[in-house]
Regions:
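C-terminal low-complexity, Ser/Thr- and acidic/Pro-rich disordered "stalk" regions positioned immediately N-terminal
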Residues: 274-311
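A broadly structural signal marking compact, well-ordered functional cores
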Residues: 70-73, 322
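C-terminal membrane-anchoring or membrane-association module
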Residues: 323-341
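Compositionally biased non-globular segments, especially hydrophobic aliphatic-rich helices
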Residues: 205, 302-304, 323, 330
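An alpha-helical repeat/solenoid feature that recognizes helix-turn-helix modules
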Residues: 2-25, 46-71, 93-126, 139-175, ...
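Long, well-ordered core segments of solenoidal/helical folds
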Residues: 1, 25-48, 73-97, 122-144, ...
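Juxtamembrane/start-of-transmembrane alpha-helix segments at the extracytoplasmic/lumenal side
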Residues: 307-322
Length: 341
């Protein structure tokens, strides 16, 4: 399943390796993925009638590997397959968020990553997607997959989706950041259930950096001189891959993928290349044009998460090399698995 185009783990690995500029040939993966998509359309009429995130993930794969998700294969009737349209603004007969808030979140991320303009006669507009996310925010600032208590991962993902529109939703974003800060442990980590989770930590790193803040720039996300970057390193195994939980004995592919995306986000914030899914032509702006000031744009906002001028003055020397090494290890492990079945 790890090396099967169209599977969740395989697709996220492909996205991340490509974003890390690992020198692999991705044409075969794209070709196999297109066959998978065409088969699903021929047999089922699409990728999924409830899980819109299937479209979003595969759209990001295609973008990452240099393809066009608006013209990715052919339907049985001979018309082109438009993954962006079918997975976002013209999603099926059921509600885009039927699977949960992540349906709205990743629809907006995929749509903005592609840079596609939404037609006037579309079922959903960009603003519809933004409103669905904003209206789902809990009174404490958090977001949840469904109605209920806040979830760190979903809150962080919502912030990533809203980052291009930060200036319009200062109150909501500041409130979400404050909630995440309160959820952070004394070790600069976040809990998923009863255990510290590297994936949750990675998602928060991506959220903060998408808003053009370094991981050590906000007092609310620093503990006794530790940052989320130093905390993430505690999940790293001796072989360079990352674990889901610190007590795990073996690394986890998705934990490693999300850790790499977090490192990419740190680098993007530092060098101005932007959010991890800021592809050429995307809606996600350059970091220099996307400076979010918590509590600074609207009167009456909650107490802002303040800036610490001293915790992020040093450069992340060797970060790019670190990512390449980790990504290369992933490639080696995958090739060994494929070779030995």
């Amino acid at each position: 399943d790890v090396v099967t185009p169209g599977s969740s783990v395989s697709d996220w690995i492909a996205i991340t390796l490509a974003r890390c500029n690992v020198p692999e040939s991705y044409s075969q993966y794209l070709e196999a993925l297109q066959k998978y998509v065409e088969t699903r359309y021929a047999e089922d009429g699409g990728l999924h009638d409830v899980k819109a995130t299937e479209y979003h993930r595969i759209s990001l794969v295609v973008l990452s590997l240099g393809g066009d998700p608006t013209n990715f294969g052919t339907k049985p009737d001979g018309t082109p397959i438009d993954l962006i349209a079918d997975g976002t603004y013209n999603f099926g007969e059921k509600e885009l968020g039927l699977q949960g808030l992540n349906g709205w979140i990743w629809a907006l991320i995929a749509l903005d990553a592609s840079g596609v303009e939404v037609p006037e006669d579309a079922r959903y507009s960009r603003q519809d997607m933004i409103d669905a996310i904003i209206n789902a925010q809990n009174s404490d600032g958090s977001f949840a997959l469904d109605k209920g208590n806040g979830d760190v991962d979903i809150t962080a993902m919502a912030l990533q989706a809203l980052s291009p529109y930060a200036g319009r939703y200062d109150r909501e974003i500041t409130s979400a950041l404050n909630w995440l800060s309160l959820e952070m442990s004394d070790n600069c980590t976040f809990f998923y259930g009863t255990s510290e989770s590297s994936e949750s930590l990675s998602q928060v790193i991506m959220a903060v950096t998408a808003l053009n803040w370094g991981v050590g720039d906000m007092v609310g996300f620093v503990r006794d001189g530790q940052t989320m970057y130093t905390a993430l390193n505690r999940f790293r195994c001796e072989n360079g891959l990352y674990k889901h939980q610190q007590e795990d004995e073996k690394p986890d592919y998705l934990a490693t993928v999300q850790a790499l995306q977090a490192l990419l986000s740190i680098r993007g914030q530092q060098n101005g290349s932007g959010y991890v899914f800021a592809y050429q032509g995307s809606i996600f702006p350059p970091q220099s044009d996307n400076v979010f000031v918590p509590g600074g744009n609207q009167a009456g906002t909650e107490e802002p998460v303040s800036e610490n001028q001293n915790t992020n003055t040093w450069l992340w020397i060797g970060l790019a090399a670190e990512m390449v090494v980790i990504a290369a290890i992933v490639v080696v492990v995958l090739k060994r698995r494929k070779k030995h079945g």
